[in-house]
């Protein structure tokens, strides 16, 4: 079976998802057909060539508005202050076409996992820097904390770069204490110590996708109905992470898997071990980034449905803040380890 020839470059995903080409579907070997009109002594044999599926492009993707959550619904284009914001449907179609094409490959999927360094702090990469948060990062800006070390097949002593927690990868096999993987968002084959990789079920399909636009501060939920056809389940305002060292960070761009859910995600006050409050209906996709409802700060305990700040400017620490009822919708609707979160700009 022909493997995907190009992987997503999520630097391109800042504005749109790259269209993928070059994936075929392996079919059974061709079989001869005997002409019904031919005589037994002069049978003509026609050979049917193997069918090769043509990769989908953005133009092949059909989006149908079939909302399951219809509160605070935004229009395709809507005014914001002195400008116009929108849902970037062309970019979203490219992302969905990429996902469709991905799933025709016979790969087994896996996830990078190292939330709060639970699987051990990643070793230092060959070349690193210290960022404005005073944390070690590779030369591409991916922090060591909560990340996964990626080794070149030619050098398994010192990692070359880091992979983000929650990133979707294709499992290629195993060699010694390493898994060989091909991340969706990073080109090439990499070796990763087994402890940092969670293998998903062979039957895993990604039919639920959440697209977060940190440029226009909105969120779209989409569900696959059949090949090339996706239903839009919600179009809502959201608030993403802001760049404010040393505590608040931008929501990272890329494609991630929903890994964990908490009905109440407790958070701490900045620079303190004291509880600051909780965020309801939290679905975690990378590091400490969750899709969640409006935060509830102590001493309050009752949930808050909506905030005037939703859909305005980045305000979160890294999370994607939603109306609480919409966060509950995502919490109930998107199955863990079978749903994708794509962050674009």
Language-model regions, residue ranges each:
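Exported/periplasmic cell-wall-interacting domains
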Residues: 22-44, 62, 80, 89-107, ...
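Sec-dependent signal peptide recognition
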Residues: 2-8
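C-terminal motif of bacterial Sec signal peptides marking the signal peptidase cleavage site
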Residues: 14-16
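SH3/SH3-like (including bacterial SH3b) beta-barrel domains
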Residues: 153-163, 231
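Bacterial signal peptide processing site
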Residues: 18-20
């Amino acid at each position: 079976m022909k493997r995907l020839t190009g992987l997503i470059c999520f630097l391109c995903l800042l504005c749109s998802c790259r269209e993928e080409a070059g994936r075929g579907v392996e079919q059974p070997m061709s079989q001869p057909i005997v002409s019904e009109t031919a005589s037994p002594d002069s049978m003509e044999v026609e050979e049917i060539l193997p069918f090769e599926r043509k990769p989908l492009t953005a133009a092949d993707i059909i989006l149908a508005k079939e909302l399951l959550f219809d509160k605070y619904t935004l229009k395709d284009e809507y005014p914001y202050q002195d400008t116009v914001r929108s849902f970037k449907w062309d970019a979203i179609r490219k992302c969905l076409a990429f996902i469709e094409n991905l799933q025709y490959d016979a790969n087994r999927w896996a996830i990078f996992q190292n939330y709060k360094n639970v699987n051990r702090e990643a070793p230092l990469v060959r070349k690193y820097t210290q960022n404005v948060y005073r944390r070690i990062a590779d030369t591409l800006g991916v922090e060591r904390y909560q990340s996964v070390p990626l080794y070149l097949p030619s050098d398994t002593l010192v990692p070359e770069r880091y992979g983000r927690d929650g990133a979707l990868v294709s499992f290629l096999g195993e060699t010694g204490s390493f898994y060989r993987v091909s991340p969706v968002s990073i080109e090439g084959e990499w070796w990763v110590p087994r402890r940092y990789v969670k293998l998903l079920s062979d039957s895993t399909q990604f039919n639920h996708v959440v697209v977060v636009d940190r440029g226009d501060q909105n969120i779209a939920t989409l569900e696959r109905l059949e090949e090339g056809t996706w239903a839009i389940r919600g179009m809502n305002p959201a608030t993403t992470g802001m760049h404010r060292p040393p505590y608040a960070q931008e929501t990272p761009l890329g494609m991630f898997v929903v890994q964990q859910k908490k009905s109440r995600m407790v958070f701490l006050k900045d620079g303190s071990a004291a509880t600051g409050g909780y965020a309801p209906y939290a679905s975690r996709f990378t590091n400490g980034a969750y899709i969640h409802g409006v935060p509830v700060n102590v001493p309050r305990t009752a949930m808050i449905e909506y905030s005037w700040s939703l859909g305005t400017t980045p305000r979160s620490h890294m999370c994607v803040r939603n109306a609480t009822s919409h966060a509950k919708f995502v919490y109930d609707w998107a199955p863990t380890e079978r749903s994708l979160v794509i962050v674009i700009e």
